[in-house]
């Protein structure tokens, strides 16, 4: 078994990568959390029913997992790697860190 690692990215790195078209943000929080407050861009693949195959084709982008605080995103990355996908990045600090960095979120679905 390969020794899977998950690389931490800062909110600033992820925001810039998304703006540059290099990163696809995959939010693994639950639908009720996403409805209350969401990242400004990205796709939602809840960890509770996580299937690495359900992640959309990133079309050349690098997948970055994100959650509330940075724990579930690590779990999702390790699960994706175990399924043979090269998705080894996550947003350290989650949406809490994202907001602390002054980055935009959207509310109300």
Question: Positions of the model-derived regions?
Answer:
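Rhodanese-like catalytic fold shared by cysteine-dependent sulfurtransferases
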Residues: 1-24, 31-62, 71-109
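Short, surface-exposed ligand- or partner-binding patches at beta-edge/loop junctions that are enriched
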Residues: 66
């Amino acid at each position: 078994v390969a020794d899977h690692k998950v690389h931490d990215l800062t909110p600033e790195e992820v925001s810039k990568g998304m703006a540059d078209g290099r990163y696809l943000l995959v939010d693994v929080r639950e639908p009720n959390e996403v409805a209350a407050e969401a990242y400004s861009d990205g796709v939602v693949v809840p960890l509770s029913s996580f299937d690495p195959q359900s992640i959309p084709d990133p079309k050349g982008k690098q997948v970055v997992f994100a959650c509330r605080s940075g724990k579930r995103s690590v779990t999702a990355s390790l699960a994706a790697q175990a399924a043979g996908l090269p998705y080894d990045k996550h947003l350290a600090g989650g949406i809490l860190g994202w907001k602390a960095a002054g980055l935009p979120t959207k509310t109300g679905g």
